């Protein structure tokens, strides 16, 4: 929501509009670790770490993952990717940005603990959820992820066949 030239995080949700802590966590990690210019959306996401009762959670999240690599935002791609690595050495690519550009890079969706193929009816459901939010005047960004094994570097070729997590 745009208020007094600042953006407030109103919702963080899965692909069908249900509240999703996973979508928030991934978007937060992406915003925290990317080194490009911070925009009002990044600032709104980063403000979550000071939410009452959530400070410890975001502190633990940052302790669990470290940044390994990134592909900065650019206006052609309309997304930013970060590669984070957990203490066990496993890496994941987190992609955040314009809904259409994120969805176009996804082959699957995460929903209620399952990873499902991005089929035509799924894509239509995603579009309907996003359209409703846009009609309500919201700025919507999407977040997706991809397990990367023990990778320590990413390229734009890695930004394909991701799993859409939410908005």
What do these predicted regions represent?
Residues 1-167:
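Conserved cytosolic headpiece of P-type ATPases
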């Amino acid at each position: 929501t745009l208020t007094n030239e600042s953006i407030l995080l109103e919702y963080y949700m899965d692909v069908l509009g249900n509240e999703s802590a996973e979508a928030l966590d991934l978007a937060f990690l992406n915003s925290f670790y990317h080194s490009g210019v911070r925009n009002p959306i990044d600032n709104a996401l980063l403000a979550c770490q000071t939410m009452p009762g959530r400070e410890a959670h975001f502190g633990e999240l940052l302790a669990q993952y470290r940044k390994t690599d990134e592909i900065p935002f650019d206006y052609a791609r309309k997304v930013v990717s970060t590669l984070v690595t957990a203490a066990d050495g496993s890496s994941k690519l987190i992609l955040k940005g314009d809904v259409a550009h994120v969805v176009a890079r996804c082959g699957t969706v995460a929903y209620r603990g399952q990873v499902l193929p991005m089929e035509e009816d799924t894509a239509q459901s995603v579009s309907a959820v996003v359209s409703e939010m846009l009609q309500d005047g919201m700025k919507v960004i999407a977040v997706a992820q991809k397990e990367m094994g023990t990778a320590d570097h990413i390229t734009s070729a890695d930004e394909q066949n991701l799993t859409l997590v939410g908005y």
